[in-house]
Amino acid sequence: MMVKELEEVVVRFSGDSGDGMQLAGNIFSNVSATVGNDICTFPDYPADIRAPQGSLTGVSGFQVHIGAGQVYTPGDRCHVLVAMNPSALKTQIKFCKPQGLIITDSDSFEARDLEKAQFKTDNPFEELGIKQEVLEVPISSMCKESLKDSELD
């Protein structure tokens, strides 16, 4: 993967409500601001108080617009969409630019997860007609592995 330096970028984190999307977005935003970037954020909470895990109505999001210069809005469509599960991908893809990058937690794209998101096939990217670059990363496994020697799980 090629590294590109950009004047500005919009990143949208999305996943189940309660899974830490606001926390992840806030940490990412704070780090970005600490290294000298200007930021503007927008948390996106679902209407459901506590929707069933993996459901379409329970997707929570956090968008951050990062810029080398002044940033005045959280941005319209994102350059990077982080989708922690199929429901997040399905409900949030509309916010991703056509030339954007989609990062998914491949650990959360099993048959039962796709069923909860009401996909009809086992290929959500094809079913949604996704043309953006997709980076499938085993995020959950990586987190568990990094915590294996701690008392956290």
Residue ranges of predicted features:
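Active-site cofactor/cluster-binding pocket
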Residues: 1-153
